[in-house]
Every structure is written in structure tokens, then in C-alpha cells.
């Protein structure tokens, strides 16, 4: 209430920001005459002048107006597009570190040019993040002529580039890259064994396109780099055959809820569709154990170490069957099970669900079950982008999430007014009792509109729903196109024609499509259809000029029919996704219309609003099969969406609290790695670490004599090197420490002399980094297990996040100690063979996958170099189940132990 009163009195924060930019806008407009008189050659000279001013101590604010004026004129000359005043305002907001909300077709891409150019002048680099490779490449090529004229370099990072090319692209003044590639490059850089192989430079300023998609929709799914592990893939096939033997608990027929008392649960498991969780009852666990034993899958108790994983396998199998549906969450293609992005409807090529879920789905669908992966490095987008000195973003729909942007990222949203008034008519929702009645009504409405000639875009939430509607349209003789994950290769063609007369398009989620639907169709696409692609640029431009008259005729005809009619076949969980669908109509002042058709059987209604709406519809006198349209119902739907959005916000906030623990630890580990990569005297670092560890052990002793703990640790570290010291139990502890340090120094000096200082330093660096990486990977797995364990402590009235922080700190302290001790032990106990005079460069390769959890996949090769040192073992033999000495990450018996 207070917020509403304040906004009426002094205006919203967004409106106040807009007013603050007006004086600067007026000054930029006045400077246009100066820019018009410049020759093309003058632009790069002016850029150098601005850079010199910054070097002499001036601020970005002091050169802002000239920089914006130059970039505006450069766009006019190279793109034949002069940025509107609203686009200049958007650029100012981006420079100030705000999120701009601009409607579809208002020119977000061009708005970013001014802010990117200004901030690139510091020489620290600007990164522009997009949601896919296509948009990164398109936007960089589109804006390159502008940046070239201004004399600043522009690059693009694509998924198929190697690290050398990536490094060159990141070194440019302005770099376009996807959020996934940027995140994986950060993780990969912190797994390198050579400083020269790092591709990124220090994070400075970042502009995020479709910022709501990246920082909100994808915030629940961390990026993960993973490697293969020895998993029991056959177990997923075994438990898949048991799904039908287990029964879900009965629900109350009126409320649709399970009984509150545990004793009243009559089945084996419960299903939480909202949280996508399966929970076994005590009875269910007993039945599962009996099934596993009777089928010969296990012998003995299910609760032994070797058998307990079957509870996890069975849980994932039930999830796969009950919560993850074909043609909704995934499709089965030539590559097996492929995940469909719930927000964009695109296939997420190469990605896999984590934690065995993908294997469970593969078993369900009867395709080859691949091995599980282990986490090697991970980060969330939230913490990735919080590392930048300044971030800003662009989207067509951010205002609904303004609270979250401010609370999590300290980013304010500025709603930029449209250049022309919005002419689209947004109708109230039409609501039906059943999905069947709803689909029939949509088909009738589309048929009427199709016959009239008005283009229609029908948005669906899944492939399954798009195919149902497609079949119904076909039976009515409605010619149409379907855009979903199964035929995404035709996306450009389908979108180009979606605004033409009589066009009917069914699309699964239009979020992040990145292409405007133009009334009358796309003129460039029309020309390409007529003259083909094998023509010169001049011939193409001439053909476009000749086609313009016919195109304008078609444009005006479609405009007179009412423009693009957008029909939503279902409300999405997020209002933003609905607004993005609506936003495809009414671009740049064009007419348009939108309406959502909803049924009480839709997922959103069933899970979050069903009972309330049923009651309200009864009061409004609605009969089964009859539609009803009322502002109260639309408000009720929006309130249901708000509840889901609030719930999802809490999930993202919760994830961030846990990830903040990992972030502090990851930052420490990565700082250690960087320090070691730069260190030219790692021998001294190891000796210091040894002395600190021996001191730590002695501090725990109660007398001047050595303790058993001290003796055990010393024997583990020094092994054969203690020969000749006699009985060390009787030596004074301080004297023993001094002798041990002498032995260690002599040991390392001898090895250094045998192969040379530089080569030895490289060997030590490799060993130190290898130990850091392998131990940190184990640590990440331990944190995963800890997180699951503390979740259950909430039942004992304990705060899970507090427990996680406290215990996470303890195991991290152990990790730091383990890294040092295992490194010291290894470098001391290995003898280097100095007989080989030719130490060639060796590459340490690992197969690792880049994963977006719950998604995963994309196999990449990490090459980690270190000079070749022949190693001869003369200390205790490696156990068959210990990690192999080569650093492959495999057990010794499965690697060099085979031979």
C-alpha cells in the first residue's frame, strides 16, 4: 500500500531514473551536429582522444556524451539506423548498471552499442552475453561495422572454438559470447596446468541479453564440468523393470492430498509434482527390498554399503516414469534422450540430467544407458556474474522480477517506453473445465481467423501439446507450421513467414527466440526465396529495393486485418514467459491481439489454482463445456502465477545460500592454483608447507617426546628416507623436526640438480595442481552428500544451511591439509630417473563434460601440460584401489596397474 502511495506521489524508481537521463539525452542530441561533420577517418581518431583522456585520469562520465554521440552517428552511417532517443536512454541505463526492459522490436541490440563502446575505452574489455551461439554470431557480425568505424575491436566466442582462438576473441575490446561458454571457460581456465592456456582476462563489464532468462530461469541449474566415473549402469535397467510393482499412496478424493498421518499412507511412495520429488514410505522400502531380493538383484539386506544405492536408483526410475515425460521434458532422437529447454522449447544438445536421472530415463526409453559422471568443477550463473565489476542487462520482460534482481544482484529495472504507442489488444483469459473443450475452442478460433487471412501464432508449453493441436488443425484443413524441438532446423524459415497473410504457426515457448515476427513476412527472406543465395551483396540489395513495393502492400493488408493474433494455449508458471509470447504481437506500434485459453486440467491450474478457480467459476454460474471470461478469473490466474514465482524465488535464494559456501571455498582453491601457476620456486613452497605441518603435529603433542600420531604421519610422508636415523621414538621432537627438514631439503635438492631447476619446478607444479584438482573433486562430492544429509536435520529443528556452513568449513579445513600432505608425500617419495636426457613435453588429458545441472553433457578435452619427467617408484607400492600415479583419476588397477 505504502509503495503504491509513494509511486503516485513521487513516481516509481524506474520513472525517476528515466527523468534523470533526460538532461544527458538533450546534450547528446545537441552534439549530433558535431558528429555529422566528422569524416569516417575521424572516428577512430576521436576514439583515441577519449582513451587518452581516460589515461590522464578523467572519468567515463566526463566523456560519456561524446562517446554516445559518436556511436550513434557510426550506427547511422554503417547500419542506416539512427538510434532513437529511447534507445539512447536505454544505453545510458545500461552504462549505469541497470536492467532495461524494452518491448519486442524496439531495438535492444542497437541500444547496447553505446554502453559497450563507452566502457570498452578503458581497455579492460566488455563482454556481451547472449543465450545461444546463433545470436552471439549474428549480433557480433551485425554490429561489427559500427565498432570498426569507431576503431574498437569486436570478437565472438563460439562453442566449436579451441582455447587459443577463444583467448584471441576475449582479448578484443568487445566480445560476444553465450552464458554457458563464458561459465565453462571460467571453470576450464581454473583447471589449466599452464597459465598460457587460460583464455579469459579479468572480468570487467558485462551486458547480458535476455538477462531474465539467464539470471532467473537458469539460476536453479548450476554449470558443472564433469568426468566419467565407474557407475553401475546395469542397475538402472534392473530397477526400471520394477517400477510397475510399486504403488503410489492413495490421495483424498476431495482435496487431492495425501493423508497427514504417516500410518495412514497405504502405498509405497508419494509424488510431489511441484518439487519433482519422490519419497518412499516405510512400507515402500520394505517392499523394494523384498523385490530386489526376490528378483536376484541383491542378496542380503538393502541397507548394506554395497546395496543401499538401489534406493537411489529406484527413486530416479520412479522420477523418470512419473515426473519426466517424453515430448515434454525431453525427446528421443538420433542421439538418444535429448533434453528440451522448458523456457525456449529448444533441444539442449549435448546436455544430460545429473545424479543418475538421465540414465533412468534412458532405461525407461530403451536406449543405451551411458555412464554416470562425477563433478570436477561447478558454479552457478548467480555467482559467475557477481564476479564482474559491473553488470547490466536487457530483456523484454524484467519488471515482474524487479524485486529478485534488486535483492540478489542489487540491480534496478528501468522500463524504457516504446518509441511508438502499443496498439495491441490483450483480451481477458477464456477458461474451460477440461483441456478437450479448450483445444476445440482454440481450433474454432484459429479456423475463423485463418479464413479471414489474419496471421496467428499459437503458443504451447510442450511438444506433446503442439502435436495435439497440429493434428486438430490438420483435420480442419488449416495449413500451418509447427516450431518445436523436433524441427528446430526450420526455425528461421518458420519465423520469417509467421507474420504473412493466412500464416498459422504453432510454437513451443517463444522465449529467447531472438527473431522478430514482421507483418507481411520478412522482406529479406522473400527475396532469398526468389533469387536464391548465390548472388552478390549488390544484387541482393537491388532485389530488396524492387520487392519493397509488394512487401509494403502485403504489410498494410495484414495490418488492416488486425495484425498478428497471439493465442496462448496454456498459462506458463512464469508471467514473464506469457508476456514474451504476447510481445511477439504489436511490435513498433503495429496492431495486434492476444488471448490465453486455459482449462482447469492445465498443470498450473491443477497444482496451484484449481480449487480456488473452481469455486469462483461456480459462483459465476459456469457450466461444464461453457467458456467463461472474467477479469476476476484473470486476476486469480495471475495470483497463482505470483505464488509459483515466489516459490521459485525462494528455491533460487536457497540455492544461492548453499552455493555461497562453495563459492568462498572455490575462490580460495582457484587463488591457490593461480599462485602455483605463477610460482617459480615451488620447492620452497613445499618445504614451508612441510614445516608448518610438522609444527602443527608437534603442537598437539603433550611432551617433548614424539607422539604416536606424529610418528605415524612421519612414516607415511618420509617412508624409506628414515633409514639410517635409527629409533626416532627417542629423539627430541624439535631435533627430529630439524632433521626431517634437512632430509626433505636434501631430497628435493638432489632431484632438482638431477633434471634442472626449471624442469623440476614444472614437475612440482604439476604434482601440486594434480593433487588440488583430485582432492577438490572429492570435496565437491562430499559437499553434495553433506547437503543431502543436512536437509533431513530440519526435522530435528536444526537450520540446514547453518549446519552446512559449519560442517562444510570443517571438511574444507581437512581438504587443505590433505592437499599439502599428499603433495609433500608424493614429491618426496618419488625418485626421478636422470638417465633420460630428452625430457619431452607431455600432455595430461582427461575426458571431461561440461554440464548444466540438472543438465549435463558436451564432451570436451582438457589438455594440461607439464614437462616429461620419468618417474621410478622406490617407495611403498600403490594399492590396487588407490588413484593411479599418472593422474588419470582412475583407480590404479584400471589404469597402469593393468600391465
UniProtKB/Swiss-Prot annotation:
Zn(2+) binds at residues 884, 886, 895-896. Its cofactor is Zn(2+). CDD domains: DEXDc_SecA, SF2_C_secA. Keywords: ATP-binding, Cell inner membrane, Cell membrane, Cytoplasm, Membrane, Metal-binding, Nucleotide-binding, Protein transport, Translocase, Translocation, Transport, Zinc. It catalyses: ATP + H2O + cellular proteinSide 1 = ADP + phosphate + cellular proteinSide 2. Monomer and homodimer. Part of the essential Sec protein translocation apparatus which comprises SecA, SecYEG and auxiliary proteins SecDF. Other proteins may also be involved. HAMAP family: SecA. This is Protein translocase subunit SecA. It comes from Borreliella afzelii (strain PKo).
Amino acid at each position: 500500500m505504502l509503495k503504491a502511495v509513494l509511486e503516485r506521489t513521487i513516481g516509481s524508481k524506474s520513472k525517476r531514473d528515466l527523468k534523470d537521463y533526460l538532461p544527458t539525452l538533450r546534450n547528446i542530441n545537441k552534439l549530433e551536429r558535431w558528429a555529422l561533420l566528422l569524416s569516417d577517418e575521424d572516428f577512430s581518431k576521436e576514439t583515441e582522444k577519449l582513451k587518452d583522456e581516460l589515461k590522464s585520469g578523467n572519468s567515463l562520465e566526463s566523456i560519456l556524451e561524446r562517446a554516445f554521440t559518436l556511436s550513434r552517428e557510426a550506427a547511422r552511417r554503417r547500419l542506416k539506423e539512427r538510434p532513437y532517443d529511447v534507445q539512447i536512454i536505454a544505453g545510458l541505463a545500461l552504462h549505469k548498471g541497470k536492467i532495461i526492459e524494452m518491448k519486442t522490436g524496439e531495438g535492444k541490440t542497437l541500444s547496447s552499442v553505446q554502453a559497450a563502446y563507452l566502457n570498452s575505452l578503458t581497455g579492460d574489455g566488455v563482454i556481451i552475453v547472449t543465450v545461444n551461439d546463433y545470436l552471439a554470431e549474428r549480433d557480433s557480425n551485425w554490429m561489427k561495422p559500427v565498432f570498426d568505424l569507431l576503431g574498437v575491436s569486436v570478437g565472438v566466442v563460439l562453442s566449436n572454438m579451441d582455447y587459443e582462438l577463444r583467448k584471441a576473441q576475449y582479448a578484443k575490446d568487445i566480445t560476444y559470447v553465450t552464458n554457458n561458454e563464458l561459465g565453462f571457460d571460467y571453470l576450464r581456465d581454473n583447471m589449466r596446468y599452464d597459465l598460457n592456456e587460460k583464455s579469459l582476462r579479468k572480468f570487467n563489464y558485462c551486458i547480458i541479453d535476455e538477462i531474465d532468462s539467464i539470471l532467473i530461469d537458469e539460476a536453479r541449474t548450476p554449470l558443472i564440468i564433469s568426468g566419467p566415473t565407474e557407475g553401475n549402469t546395469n542397475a538402472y535397467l534392473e530397477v526400471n523393470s520394477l517400477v510397475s510393482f510399486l504403488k503410489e499412496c492413495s490421495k483424498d478424493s476431495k482435496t487431492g492430498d495425501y493423508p497427514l498421518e504417516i500410518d495412514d499412507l497405504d502405498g509405497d511412495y508419494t509424488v510431489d509434482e511441484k518439487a519433482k520429488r519422490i519419497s518412499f514410505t516405510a512400507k515402500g522400502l520394505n517392499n523394494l527390498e523384498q523385490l530386489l531380493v526376490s528378483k536376484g538383484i541383491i542378496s542380503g539386506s538393502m541397507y548394506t554399503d554395497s546395496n543401499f544405492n538401489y534406493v537411489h536408483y529406484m527413486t530416479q526410475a520412479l522420477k523418470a516414469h512419473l515426473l519426466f515425460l517424453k515430448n515434454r521434458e525431453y525427446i528421443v532422437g538420433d542421439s538418444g534422450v535429448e533434453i528440451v529447454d522448458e523456457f525456449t522449447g529448444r533441444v539442449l544438445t549435448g546436455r544430460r540430467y545429473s545424479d543418475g536421472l538421465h540414465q533412468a530415463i534412458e532405461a525407461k526409453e530403451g536406449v543405451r544407458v551411458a555412464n554416470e559422471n562425477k563433478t570436477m568443477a561447478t558454479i552457478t550463473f548467480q555467482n559467475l556474474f557477481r564476479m564482474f565489476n559491473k553488470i547490466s542487462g536487457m530483456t523484454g520482460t524484467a519488471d515482474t522480477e524487479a524485486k529478485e534482481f534488486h535483492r540478489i544482484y542489487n540491480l534496478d529495472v528501468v522500463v524504457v517506453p516504446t518509441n511508438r504507442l502499443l496498439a495491441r489488444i490483450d483480451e481477458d483469459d477464456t477458461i474451460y473445465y477440461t483441456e478437450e473443450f479448450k483445444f476445440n475452442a482454440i481450433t474454432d478460433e484459429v479456423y475463423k481467423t485463418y479464413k479471414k487471412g489474419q496471421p496467428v501464432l499459437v503458443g504451447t508449453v510442450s511438444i506433446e501439446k503442439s502435436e495435439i493441436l497440429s493434428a486438430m488443425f490438420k483435420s480442419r484443413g488449416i495449413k500451418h507450421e509447427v516450431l518445436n524441438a523436433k524441427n528446430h532446423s526450420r526455425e528461421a524459415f518458420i519465423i520469417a513467414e509467421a507474420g504473412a497473410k493466412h500464416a498459422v504457426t504453432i510454437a513451443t515457448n517463444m522465449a529467447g527466440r531472438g527473431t522478430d515476427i514482421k507483418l507481411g513476412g520478412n522482406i529479406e527472406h522473400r527475396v532469398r526465396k526468389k533469387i536464391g543465395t548465390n548472388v552478390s551483396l549488390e544484387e541482393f540489395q537491388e532485389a530488396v529495393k524492387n520487392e519493397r513495393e509488394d512487401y509494403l502492400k502485403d504489410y498494410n493488408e495484414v495490418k488492416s486485418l488486425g495484425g498478428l493474433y497471439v493465442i496462448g494455449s496454456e498459462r506458463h508458471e512464469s508471467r514473464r514467459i506469457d508476456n514474451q509470447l504476447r510481445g511477439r504481437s504489436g511490435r513498433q506500434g503495429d496492431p495486434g491481439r492476444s488471448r490465453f485459453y486455459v482449462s482447469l486440467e492445465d498443470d498450473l491450474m491443477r497444482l496451484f489454482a484449481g480449487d480456488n478457480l473452481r469455486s469462483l467459476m461456480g459462483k459465476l454460474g459456469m457450466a461444464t463445456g461453457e467458456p467463461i471470461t472474467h477479469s476476476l478469473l484473470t486476476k486469480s490466474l495471475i495470483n497463482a502465477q505470483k505464488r509459483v514465482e515466489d516459490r521459485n524465488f525462494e528455491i533460487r535464494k536457497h540455492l544461492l545460500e548453499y552455493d555461497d559456501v562453495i563459492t568462498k571455498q572455490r575462490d580460495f582453491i582457484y587463488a591457490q592454483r593461480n599462485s602455483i601457476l605463477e610460482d617459480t620456486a615451488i620447492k620452497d613452497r613445499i618445504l614451508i608447507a612441510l614445516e608448518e605441518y610438522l609444527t602443527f603435529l608437534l603442537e598437539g603433542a603433550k611432551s617433548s617426546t614424539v607422539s604416536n600420531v606424529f610418528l605415524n604421519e612421519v612414516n607415511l610422508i618420509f617412508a624409506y628416507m628414515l633409514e639410517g636415523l635409527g629409533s626416532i621414538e627417542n629423539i627430541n621432537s624439535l631435533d627430529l623436526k630439524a632433521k626431517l627438514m634437512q632430509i626433505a631439503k636434501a631430497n628435493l635438492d638432489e632431484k632438482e640438480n638431477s633434471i634442472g631447476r626449471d624442469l623440476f619446478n614444472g614437475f612440482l607444479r604439476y604434482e601440486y595442481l594434480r593433487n588440488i584438482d583430485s582432492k577438490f573433486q572429492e570435496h565437491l562430492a562430499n559437499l553434495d552428500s553433506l547437503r543431502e544429509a543436512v536437509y533431513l536435520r530440519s526435522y530435528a529443528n536444526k537450520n540446514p544451511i547453518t549446519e552446512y556452513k559449519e560442517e562444510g568449513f570443517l571438511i574444507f579445513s581437512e581438504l587443505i591439509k590433505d592437499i599439502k600432505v599428499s603433495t609433500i608425500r608424493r614429491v618426496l617419495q618419488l625418485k626421478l630417473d636422470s638417465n633420460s636426457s630428452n625430457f619431452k613435453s607431455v600432455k595430461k588429458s582427461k575426458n571431461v563434460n561440461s554440464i548444466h545441472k540438472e543438465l549435463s553433457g558436451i564432451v570436451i578435452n582438457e589438455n594440461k601440460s607439464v614437462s616429461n619427467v620419468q618417474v621410478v617408484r622406490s617407495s611403498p607400492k600403490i594399492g590396487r584401489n588407490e588413484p593411479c600415479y599418472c593422474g588419470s583419476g582412475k583407480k590404479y588397477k584400471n589404469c597402469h596397474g593393468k600391465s
